[in-house]
């Protein structure tokens, strides 16, 4: 999903590329939602051994409906088209990522590790929880929506209590405002 939203030092490679000897036992799943800014369209695809893909087709055909023909055509155009817009988006995501990472680390109790792609940060807020007397990341997240008017997702929703997820898929101006609100609400 984030194949092109990446700015790490090493080039992105799939598992099949990393372990060619496992190619015939590898299933690669991808989609256009994130890299092509088509979130909500639910267009995905996969590649792998034909017997496994055949089984997946049987399950999929009975459990989900088809994407609209317009969405399918748009996905094909995106996959076959220029990546120039993606590169421009990635530059903007990187700027927002770097700002948000640094700004959160300036807030007492936040510990944010820089990422190499996507458009989320997942800071460790265990010190904030302890210092401010919150029960857990869920209570902190509820507090931030109520007091700072900033929506975050508790890390426990992803199996990582003590963390929160923040998206930077918005303008830098809104990110700065959100950071100020978070900081002010915790002072």
Identify the residue ranges that each predicted region occupies.
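PLP-dependent class I/II
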Residues: 1-187
